[in-house]
């Protein structure tokens, strides 16, 4: 809507990484466009594009990180908390191994925020990402807490974040395992109340499985008896 010329290259219309190397693709697209946004799977792909394109490359989403979502989330938290970000606390509860939890951890550390991760220890962010975030937080005054206790994670926060428990491409069999692991980390009215903050707000990058109004939501209800998964 800003008048830029945009070309969308979907996977079936591109040979990136298949018949043409990432390096060659980056060099060609960098001569044709003023910027490139990559939305895909591998973090290594977007980093290689950035290395060889010669123009700005934006990470629209990878398995590891979701920085463009963080720009929107930081703005949303700033608008709706009424406080500077450095005085804002938020929690992420659920499966914390992937892009949303990783990115929220890094975002909070960089902006000097109070960041809580509530998840089973087996589903925490990787040690090297946590170590990087803690190092940054030391410089910015950020606070980082990782806990297996969901109520401890949300105590006193301004925002509670979550994401889907099973990602695109994972088999249906993964649902039972995640439900067993994460049933105590669903965002419910009770968990919201456990924050002790009557103004606490809920955030989700979407799509969310919160009712039966989708094919997946209905299948989850019929299979597991849950009306809503990560949030009710």
UniProtKB/Swiss-Prot annotation:
It catalyses: carbamoyl phosphate + L-ornithine = L-citrulline + phosphate + H(+). One of its GO terms (biological process) is L-arginine biosynthetic process. Carbamoyl phosphate binds at residues 15, 39, 66-69, 204-207, 232. It comes from the Bacteria. The keyword Transcription does not apply. Keywords: Amino-acid biosynthesis, Arginine biosynthesis, Cytoplasm, Transferase. Pfam families: OTCace, OTCace_N. The keyword Nucleotide-binding does not apply. The record marks 79 as: Important for structural integrity. It is found in: Cytoplasm. One of its GO terms (molecular function) is amino acid binding. Pathway: Amino-acid biosynthesis; L-arginine biosynthesis; L-arginine from L-ornithine and carbamoyl phosphate: step 1/3. InterPro entries: Asp/Orn_carbamoyltranf_P-bd (IPR006132), Asp/Orn_carbamoylTrfase (IPR006130), Asp/Orn_carbamoylTrfase_sf (IPR036901), Asp_carbamoyltransf_Asp/Orn-bd (IPR006131), Orn/put_carbamltrans (IPR002292). Its EC number is 2.1.3.3. L-ornithine binds at residues 99, 163, 167-168. Gene3D superfamilies: Aspartate/ornithine carbamoyltransferase. GO terms for cellular component: cytoplasm. Belongs to the aspartate/ornithine carbamoyltransferase superfamily. OTCase family. Reversibly catalyzes the transfer of the carbamoyl group from carbamoyl phosphate (CP) to the N(epsilon) atom of ornithine (ORN) to produce L-citrulline. PANTHER family: ORNITHINE CARBAMOYLTRANSFERASE, ORNITHINE CARBAMOYLTRANSFERASE, MITOCHONDRIAL. This is Ornithine carbamoyltransferase. It comes from Neisseria pharyngis. The lineage of its organism: Bacteria, Pseudomonadati, Pseudomonadota, Betaproteobacteria, Neisseriales. The gene is argF.
């Amino acid at each position: 809507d800003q008048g830029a010329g945009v070309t969308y290259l979907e996977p079936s219309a591109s040979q990136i990484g298949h018949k043409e190397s990432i390096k060659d693709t980056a060099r060609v697209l960098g001569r044709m466009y003023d910027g490139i946004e990559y939305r895909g799977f591998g973090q290594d792909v977007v980093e290689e594009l950035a290395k060889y394109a010669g123009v700005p490359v934006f990470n629209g989403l990878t398995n590891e990180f979701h920085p463009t979502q963080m720009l929107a989330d930081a703005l949303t938290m700033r608008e709706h908390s009424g406080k500077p970000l450095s005085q804002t606390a938020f929690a992420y509860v659920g499966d914390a191994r992937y892009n949303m939890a990783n990115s929220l951890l890094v975002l909070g550390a960089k902006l000097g925020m109070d960041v809580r991760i509530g998840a089973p220890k087996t589903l925490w962010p990787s040690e090297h990402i946590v170590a990087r975030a803690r190092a940054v937080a030391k410089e910015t005054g950020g606070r980082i807490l990782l806990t297996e206790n969901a109520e401890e994670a949300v105590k006193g926060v301004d925002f509670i974040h979550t994401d889907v428990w099973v990602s695109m491409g994972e088999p249906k069999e993964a649902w039972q395992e995640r439900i067993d692991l994460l049933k105590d980390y669903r965002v419910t009215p009770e968990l919201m109340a456990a924050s002790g903050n009557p103004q606490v707000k809920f955030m989700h990058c979407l799509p969310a499985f919160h009712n039966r109004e989708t094919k997946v939501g209905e299948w989850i209800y019929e299979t597991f008896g849950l009306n809503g998964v990560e949030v009710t």
